[in-house]
C-alpha cells in the first residue's frame, strides 16, 4: 500500500508506548484487567493495542499484521457475543471526524465501554451532540503531538483520549457537554464574519 493510499485511509498509527499507557489508564479508570478482558479493536492498524491484549478480536479493512480479521467494521456483520466487552483503539477519523463518530457510536452499542483516541474536536458540544445519548463520558486526556507515526516516522496530530461508557462506572462524573454553550453575554455580541447577523 503506497503512502497516498495510507493517508487517504487515515493509517496514522499509535506508538506502542502510547498504547501501553492508554491501556493502563483504561484499566485504572474502569477498574478492570483490560489485558485479559473481552476486547475488540475495530481498526487494528499496526496492532499497537491488540498486540498487548490477550482476549481481543481485532478487525481492519486492510490487515497488515497476523491475527487481524479483514473486515469493514462499519458494515453489517456478526460479532461474537461477549459479556462486559470493551472497545479500545485509534479509529480512522475521516473528514471532520465523521468516521470516528460512526466507530464510536457502533462500539458504544456493542460494548460496555469505549476507550478511543479521537480528534480534539470531540471535546466540543457540536460533536458530542451527535454521540449516542446513552453514552457517558467519564475520562479524557489530551495526547502529546508525538503519540503517532506514519510510515515508521513520528507524525503529529491533535488528539484526545476519551472513555465513554454504557451501564458501567455510573458513580463517576459525566464529563459530557449536555447543552450547547452560551454564545451571548450582556456586554458582548458575536457576529458572523460577514457582519450581517449575530451568530447562532
What are the roles of these predicted feature ranges?
Residues 1-200:
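Class I S-adenosyl-L-methionine-dependent methyltransferase catalytic core
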Amino acid at each position: 500500500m503506497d503512502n497516498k493510499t495510507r493517508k487517504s485511509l487515515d493509517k496514522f498509527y499509535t506508538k506502542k508506548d502510547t498504547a501501553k499507557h492508554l491501556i493502563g489508564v483504561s484499566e485504572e479508570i474502569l477498574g478492570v484487567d483490560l489485558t485479559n478482558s473481552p476486547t475488540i479493536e475495530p481498526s487494528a492498524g499496526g496492532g499497537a493495542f491488540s498486540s498487548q491484549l490477550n482476549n481481543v478480536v481485532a478487525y481492519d479493512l486492510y490487515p497488515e499484521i497476523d491475527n487481524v480479521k479483514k473486515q469493514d467494521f462499519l458494515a453489517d456483520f456478526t460479532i461474537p457475543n461477549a459479556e462486559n466487552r470493551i472497545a479500545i483503539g485509534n479509529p480512522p477519523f475521516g473528514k471532520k471526524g465523521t468516521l470516528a463518530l460512526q466507530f464510536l457510536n457502533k462500539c458504544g452499542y456493542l460494548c460496555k465501554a469505549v476507550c478511543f483516541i479521537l480528534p480534539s474536536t470531540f471535546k466540543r458540544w457540536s460533536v458530542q451532540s451527535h454521540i449516542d445519548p446513552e453514552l457517558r463520558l467519564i475520562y479524557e486526556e489530551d495526547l502529546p503531538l508525538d503519540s503517532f507515526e506514519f510510515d515508521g516516522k513520528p507524525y503529529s496530530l491533535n488528539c484526545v483520549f476519551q472513555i465513554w461508557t454504557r451501564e458501567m462506572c455510573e458513580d463517576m462524573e459525566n464529563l459530557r457537554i449536555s447543552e450547547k454553550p452560551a454564545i451571548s453575554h450582556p456586554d458582548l455580541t458575536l457576529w458572523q464574519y460577514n457582519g450581517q447577523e449575530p451568530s447562532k
